[in-house]
């Protein structure tokens, strides 16, 4: 607990909030180019081959982004839109690729939760 004299000498510093997605630089999404598309395994107790992409963003950052949904068409040099949002069982993956925009097509035959996977309403 500081004394009044100490508080006069230097005031309390406001708490700085640390962003969970620094590579986006305060933007809701960022465009980037895939440099590598590959699979990684989640941490215990889960088991799978999760699809991820290494993306070089327009902000200059090189990040690892998760590719949601079943099946994708991404390869090296694909241009993608990246949003924030981590994947809990993949350490170091703090971003998601937005499906249905730029080079990332929507998930095929998706009926429910279509808006999250870039799928138009079926006729």
Swiss-Prot record:
GO terms for biological process: translation. Transmembrane segments: none annotated. PROSITE patterns: RIBOSOMAL_S12. It comes from the Eukaryota. It is found in: Plastid, Chloroplast. InterPro entries: NA-bd_OB-fold, Ribosomal_uS12, Ribosomal_uS12_bac. Keywords: Chloroplast, Plastid, Ribonucleoprotein, Ribosomal protein, RNA-binding, rRNA-binding. Gene3D superfamilies: Nucleic acid-binding proteins. GO terms for cellular component: chloroplast; small ribosomal subunit. GO terms for molecular function: rRNA binding; structural constituent of ribosome. Belongs to the universal ribosomal protein uS12 family. With S4 and S5 plays an important role in translational accuracy. Located at the interface of the 30S and 50S subunits. Part of the 30S ribosomal subunit. This is Small ribosomal subunit protein uS12cz/uS12cy. The lineage of its organism: Eukaryota, Viridiplantae, Streptophyta, Embryophyta, Tracheophyta. The gene is rps12-A.
